Amino acid sequence: GASGIGLLRTESVVIKELTEAQQVEAYKTCIKNSGGKPITVRTYDWAADDCGQWMDGVQTRMEEETTALTQLSALMQAAVEAPEGALQVLFPMIPDVDAWRTRMDQMKRCNESLKEKGLPFCGNLPVGCLIEIPAAALMAGEIIDAGADFLAVDLDDLVQYTCGVSRREKPTPADNPAVLRLVQDVMHAAQTRGVPLYLCGIMQKDLETMPAFMRIGVRNFCVESVHINTLKSILMQTEL
């Protein structure tokens, strides 16, 4: 019953050290298996849980840059197999507008490189920002103004960084008033600029809190496939 893939994690393609050509084929397979439905690909997240703590401090800035350019180039090439606009790129770890502009510069460089090589590619992929920390939430409008086509709010991370809690501590409810206010601010920034927004990073324990987000205007949710029917049932019973 899902309308698309809201967040495709790609840490495995980097950890496995796939070449650019291998990444292109991997993304093409995902596009083919999606049956024409939209796919939002989150670029490699150096802070992702499945990267392991051993990654901390090991990767240099140059390695990060090389990894990013290789992945973006592969995505732009694979996108020629998707319906127009069906493959979207979501950038994590964006704390401010400067970080966003760095990603846009990388997209531009990949575009120019692929043109020089004469390879088929899609040069106008929709690009979005993953809102994970309060700083990004407060600057959402400026990030959109700098070129973001859509926003995704990582609820799990936003709760952690807003409330100053560790995942090892007693879980903080996702509908914490401070979190709701931040999400509402992000919603306002997106709505006034005509940009789509959705929630992701929704843990099983937080499903029952989703009506609170629906009441402040959120209409799109990204959850693990096993939770889709449960979330639908909860939302259908919500009184606005």
What are the residue ranges of the model-derived segments?
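Conserved alpha/beta-domain cores
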Residues: 1-240
